[in-house]
């Protein structure tokens, strides 16, 4: 492992793995810091408690002022800076403002490259076949058998022609019969070997694609939410389906065909020299130009294949989004507009396909012409050699067949190379997804003792911007305390960041600075999976999966396999959902459709509440859970919510009086800060308070000499 030089700079996020290292000696060259993992660990082990400010390890205490000054400014909120003693001044200008002006963002996938591993992409492709090496080795063995038998045929057929061409003896018929019988058996063995080869390659290919898709899906689900903010769903689906299939073919069927073509070409060339060295030298002079053409064509095809896969991903994304929102399209009558948009995307794909077709036509046309010229040159030169008695008719026939096989094999190698380049083009993005490390830890960190766990929450001096919109500040010095077992309501104007509070509590994002704590522990120190297992959420528009009602409710349990039907039904009863569920023809086995489209808003809400009940969380987050419901459904849902909130730490994000008035504490959020706090009654007593104005806008308050609270009228 190469250690960084004294002029090297390392940026480490305040939470998460090391990101980038930059060395001024090589200008803008970027390394992933994972290459220096042991050194990174040594550095980070010397840094004290996370979140306590930037601290340099003792060996680097003499760091000059440039980096030190930047470290104590806004940059310290984002990264730790570790540098050699001569790194500061050349780099200071690059580090002003954002966390790293001269360093590319790992989350920007358009710039991000896969981690350097010391292997080429070809070796990465071959690395996929390692788990199947047993079957593939057997397939290669059968490939060798079938190739040897195939390439021995011209030699023996040439001998048969010589036997037929010369004057036959008395035993001519018997000899010919025996020779043909032996060759028939040999050819049958070759056919069997080839069939077994194809089966082993096909089955191995399917296993590789299956494993590749599973690994890719697992890697995608482990990424932080900010990754999905920047990456389109349709693109990920295309990588998961089309690219994996293309890559799988490249390392199995295509690799098998390439090995076969290479073996046959090698044996064929050897036999051509065995039959007639002078004729072989004359004929094979055309191979180098074809090889150069194949390399140029392959490189062009690789770039074109990547562009084609990207264009296909864009078309898939558009189709997936539009089909998923067909009701909105139908409501606005925009069917033909969307057809035109999709047609434009597939037309781009067609243009790329036409470019590929033109390139293939030129290359394979040139390869075919070369093959025909080879045959013609063999006939011409071979005829001259026969005329001078240097070749027999059988030898010329054998040579022609070998030349034919070599020509086919060269064509097969050309196809192999072009398909390999396609696989590499598709594999580039797959390697990025497979090797991408999430910025937030997935399943590591501290777990609190269940016996002492209370569920007290606190935001302290939180500053936050969404990674996809770093220029828009959401929170500025935001602080809020939610005692254990209390019910806190958070209200504020639209866009003030109320739902962002839920995202931070679930640790879907980390704050730029400040802390979010649970029972006094910074949640960035806690295991995210454990943390989320203790939090239940019910949102304004809950998302259900396209499966049965029972499966959707059971989804809230920690262990799906241990959930009983009685537990599901009990949760549904407490959530006021059992009655309408049992009215369905299939009851709890009723499939709810994509995103629960076959259910009403109130029904989806109550199923979501049942799902949260089955989870039995210590902390409950309600995000506008009743705002989109009519009066009847709101009453049923609110009744279920009241049962759900018993004995839990609850944060309610709402503007409906029925939801807010029973809260122990109300906090008003505006411009990224808590501007008012107190009980519902206390806040209403402030004549110019924002809370009172919000209540007026929602028609909760009327002035008739006395204050009365009225529910807003609904159409």
Swiss-Prot record:
Its EC number is 7.6.2.-. Residues 83-133, 202-252, 299-357, 418-715 are mitochondrial matrix. The chain crosses the membrane at residues 134-157, 179-201, 253-275, 279-298, 358-381, 396-417. One of its GO terms (biological process) is mitochondrial unfolded protein response. Residues 136-422 form the ABC transmembrane type-1 domain. Oxidized glutathione (GSSG) stimulates ATP hydrolysis without affecting ATP binding, whereas reduced glutathione (GSH) inhibits ATP binding and hydrolysis. It comes from the Eukaryota. Keywords: Acetylation, ATP-binding, Glutathionylation, Magnesium, Membrane, Metal-binding, Mitochondrion, Mitochondrion inner membrane, Nucleotide-binding, Transit peptide, Translocase, Transmembrane, Transmembrane helix, Transport. CDD domains: ABC_6TM_ABCB10_like (cd18573), ABC_MTABC3_MDL1_MDL2 (cd03249). Residues 457-696 form the ABC transporter domain. Belongs to the ABC transporter superfamily. ABCB family. Mitochondrial peptide exporter (TC 3.A.1.212) subfamily. This is ATP-binding cassette sub-family B member 10, mitochondrial. It comes from Mus musculus.
